[in-house]
Amino acid sequence: MSSGSITTGRTSGLLTLAIGALFYSSGSIARPDLQPLGPNIADKGSAFYHFTQRQYDSADGERHYRVWTAVPDKAPPAAGYPVLYMLDGNAVMDKLDDAFLQQLFAGSPPVIVAIGYQTALPFDTAARAWDYTPPLKTHEPRAGKPALPPRKTGGNDVFRQLLTETMVPQTEANLKIDPHQRAIWGHSYGGLFVLDAWRKASLFGIYYSASPSLGQALQSPLQASQSLDAVRFRGKS
């Protein structure tokens, strides 16, 4: 396992390449622009997919989510659609376009579920810092470095419970989904969440952890993975 990405050969190569082309060539996630977003593909409409939205609130009422579900306008395979859950859903939806969806549609297109927040911005930085990070060890600031105001972190177990017990079941309730092709993708803090979910969650079989944030205080998922029982993770990739 590396800090670059966790991918799989089980999903289509086209999907893997398309994700890379969409997000890394543009630098849209690595160098985010925090300006308000305009209409996205769900607002404009697609010739290949149809979109629905759901809204959720965290149990403490502090965070508010918007979840877009894109379903191919094509009958599912006998085993069901593959499904890809993507964190930072506002930024994802801003970059999706019909040319990309047409590429997916030409093969065995997945259902795409973009999990974002109820904001006009591409990222809710405070919410994702809490939702995507594990409980952190406290570190003193380096000598000569001013201490920054703390950002609330460490809530990924709470968010993962909302994701796996509420969002996923409600999203898939009326869809024919292949559970063996259920994937999750995240970048930076989102990649850290995916890395930790690989250790802890059994719902997903395929994990895309792209450039996970592994700073000094965020090493715990990677360190814990070094001593895992391989048998326990058979069937995950």
Task: Outline where the language-model segments fall.
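Serine-hydrolase catalytic machinery in alpha/beta-hydrolase-like enzymes
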Residues: 79-162, 166, 170, 174
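A domain-start/cap signature at the N-terminus of enzymes
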Residues: 28-81
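The feature captures the conserved acid-bearing segment of alpha/beta-hydrolase catalytic domains
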Residues: 211-237
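Bacterial N-terminal signal peptides
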Residues: 16-24
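Gly/Ala-rich beta-loop-alpha elbow adjacent to hydrolase catalytic centers
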Residues: 186-190, 194
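Conserved hydrolase catalytic core segment
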Residues: 196-205
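Alpha/beta-hydrolase fold nucleophile elbow
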Residues: 176-187
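Residue in the alpha/beta-hydrolase core beta-strand immediately N-terminal to the catalytic nucleophile
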Residues: 183, 206-208
